[in-house]
Amino acid sequence: MGNQDKMSTPGRWMSLDIGTKRVGIALSDPLGITARPFSVIPRRPRLFDHIQALVQEYDVRGIVVGIPRRTGGEETELCDQVRQLASELEKRLGIKVRTYDERYSTKEAERMMSERGIPVRERRARRDAFAAAVILQWFLEEHDR
């Protein structure tokens, strides 16, 4: 599960920004070129079922999971949990699951929401989905089309 893999065929990708309480979800367009925020869901026991349903409904070919590192690149307490979840997703769903450094994604998500005129009071509820979209867009831009 590295982020150096090359992607040779187009398809829709999903991104997950996994926190301790919530999971932000983003989806790409069907060609895997642009990312958009999709939803924020609680991190709960049936998380796998919810993700599997979305993968099937939107014909997702791969998932990008953000790895929460500190600004200096050090691992956070959540990194191991996120890697385990990514590994389990790959086993259960039978599709590619890649990890990607999510540093600065929340800051970029805040900037995007501000530029789009999203009221401050609404931003907290949407932040994780926007951060997932940032992670996914970075991933898509870094890989060959």
Task: Name each region found by the language model.
Residues 2-16, 20-145:
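Phosphate- and other anionic-substrate recognition elements at nucleic-acid/protein interfaces
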